[in-house]
């Protein structure tokens, strides 16, 4: 049996280390999700973000955001990666797209933050 080595992406490994050192439980939970194999990370479509959020919410996705569906209110989406169409639809609705790498500096208010895992 092969020993589990974790992510081979150096940037993801550094991000996991950085997130796990944070004091907020949300970032520790995101670090746990990122430690899973890449095929077990969540892939969230735009229509789910639209369904489960209110205007001006912050959504954290420890995986990839895909562009199926429409978004009819502004939402800030933080994720490991985005498809091109998902970025366009989020920005078209007045929302913001933030990578997990930059989210530690930009997300300060945790009142309207939702973690979405599919």
From Swiss-Prot:
Keyword Ribosomal protein: yes
Gene Ontology molecular-function annotations: structural constituent of ribosome
Keyword Ribosomal protein: yes
Similarity field: Belongs to the eukaryotic ribosomal protein eL18 family.
Organism of provenance: Sulfurisphaera tokodaii (strain DSM 16993 / JCM 10545 / NBRC 100140 / 7) (Sulfolobus tokodaii)
Keywords for this protein: Ribonucleoprotein, Ribosomal protein
GO terms classed as biological process: translation
Protein known as: Large ribosomal subunit protein eL18
Gene Ontology CC terms, in alphabetical order: ribonucleoprotein complex; ribosome
InterPro entries attached to this UniProt entry: Ribosomal_eL18/eL18-A/B/_CS (IPR021132), Ribosomal_eL18_arc (IPR022947), Ribosomal_uL15/eL18 (IPR021131), Ribosomal_uL15/eL18_sf (IPR036227), Ribosomal_uL15_CS (IPR001196)
Pfam families: Ribosomal_L27A (PF00828)
Cross-referenced HAMAP family: Ribosomal_eL18
